[in-house]
Amino acid sequence: MAAAVLGFAASTAPALPWQPADDAAVLEHVPARSELERLAPLRAALMAHPQDLQVALALSSGYIDIGRRNSDPRFIAYAQATLLPWVSRASPPERALVLQAIALQYLHRFGAALTLLDRAIALVPLDGQAWLTRASLLELRGDYPDARRACARLMLRADEFAALTCLASVDGRSGRLTESYSALRNSGGDPRLPAPLRAWRLGALADMAERLGDDRMAEAYLKAALHASRDDPYLRAAYADLLLRLGRPVEVVALLKDSEAQDPLLLRLAIAGRRSGNAQAGRWSQLYDERLRAAARDGDSSHQREQAMYLLEVRDDPRAALEVAARNWSVQREPADLRVYARAAARANSPHDLAAIARWCAATHYEDHLLSLPPAARVAERPL
C-alpha cells in the first residue's frame, strides 16, 4: 500500500534465486509499455525538480494506479519511495500523507494507513479524500459505526454523491440492507460523474443485490460497473466469483483468458478451468501455485483471501484453507472474506469457526442471503 522497503532490500544479502517448476512460467507482470511511458515525463520532471510536491504527487498517483490495475505491488512500492521524502518531514504535506495511506491500504497495512489519515485530517479537517479513504478502511475492517461517522463527514463538504454511496454501503452491512439498497437505487447515477465514481456506486449496488439474493440484478450492476471501468481488477474478480457461484465457469474463462498476469484473476481462471475441463486448467493452477510460493518467499501476505480460495477450490484442502481464511478474517472483513471463511469452516466441519461467524453477524446485524443457507447447502455451494 517504500523507499524504506527498497532500502532494506538493498542493505541485506540477496536471497538465493528461486526457480519455478515450469521454466515457461511467468512470475512477474510488466505493465504495458504505454502505461510506463505515460509516467516518463513525470519521472524526468521530478529528477530535475525533486522539491516539486505537485510532480511527486502526480507520479506517485500514477504508480498507485498502475499497481492497482495490474495487481502489481512493485508499483505501490515505487509510489511509497516517491512520497517518502515528503512524509518523512517534520511537517509533511497533507496530500502526501493521504496518498501514502492509500498505498498502505493496498498492502493491507490498515493500522498504519489509518494513523496517516488521522494526521492528514488534523491538518485539513474537511479533506474529502481522506475521510472517504478512512471510511473505506474502517468498513473493510468491519468497524461500521466509525465508518459511518467518517461517511457523514462528507456531507460537510456538500459531496452528496460520495456521502450517500458511502453511507449506503456501510449501512447495508450493518442491519439496513434493504433500505440502503433502495435508497442507493433511487439516487440515480449521474452520467456526468467520472467513470470510477459511477463504477463505485454500481459495484456497491451489485454487492447489496447479491446479499439480498437477487443474482440477476447483481449481474446487471456488475456488467454496468465494468462498462464504466472495464479494467478494474476488483470488479472483474467480483463478476467472476458470481459466475462461478452460478455454475458458469466457461464464461469466466472467456472473461479472464487474457488476465493471467494478475494473480487474483489467475486464481479465478484456475478454478473455472478446473470446473469446465479446460485444457489450460493444469497450467493455470501450477502458475498460481508458483506465484503463491514467490509471494511467500517475499513475505507478501496481502492476498490471503485468494490463497484460502485456492486451497479450498483447487487443492481441496479445507483444513489448510480454514487456517488461512481465519487469519485473513482477523485483518479484513469484506463480504467475500466472510463467505470464504464460512465455506472453509463448513467444509472443514469447524463448529467453533461457524459459531464465531454467527456471533459476528448477530453483533453487527450483518445480512447475507448466501450465509443464511443451511450448512449442507453451504458446503455444496460453489465458491463464494
Language-model segments: residues:
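Residue-level detector of the short coil/turn that links helix A to helix B
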Residues: 74, 108, 142, 175, ...
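N-terminal leader/linker segments that initiate helical-solenoid repeat arrays
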Residues: 7-95, 379-382
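Canonical positions in the second alpha-helix
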Residues: 45, 85-86, 119-120, 153-154, ...
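Residue at a conserved register position within TPR or TPR-like alpha-solenoid repeats
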Residues: 63, 70, 104, 138, ...
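Canonical tetratricopeptide repeat
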Residues: 58, 99, 133, 166-167, ...
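Short coil turns that delineate tetratricopeptide repeat
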Residues: 50, 91, 125, 158-159, ...
